[in-house]
Structures are given as structure tokens and as C-alpha cells.
Amino acid sequence: DSPGGASDTQKQHXVNSXXXKXY
């Protein structure tokens, strides 16, 4: 995950699990 805020990290994790981006 890209460094940022805790909320941003959680959001990206969710998106990563669901859609599998490239984070």
C-alpha cells in the first residue's frame, strides 16, 4: 500500500481485496 493516512490504507485494502488494483 502507498504511505498516507490510516483511513486511506484501510480504503485501499478494501479496494485491493475487492477489485485487486495495483496498490
UniProtKB/Swiss-Prot annotation:
Keyword Transport appears in the UniProt entry: yes
Keyword Secreted: yes
GO molecular function annotation: oxygen carrier activity
Keywords: Copper, Oxygen transport, Secreted, Transport
Subcellular location: Secreted, Extracellular space
Main location: secreted
GO cellular component term, pick one: extracellular region
Superkingdom of the source species: Eukaryota
Expression tissues: Hemolymph.
Gene Ontology terms: biological process: oxygen transport
Region of interest (Disordered), ranges: 1-23
Family per record: Belongs to the tyrosinase family. Hemocyanin subfamily.
Function description: Hemocyanins are copper-containing oxygen carriers occurring freely dissolved in the hemolymph of many mollusks and arthropods.
Protein name from the UniProt record: Hemocyanin subunit 1
Organism expressing this protein natively: Cancer pagurus
The organism's taxonomic lineage, starting at the top: Eukaryota, Metazoa, Ecdysozoa, Arthropoda, Crustacea
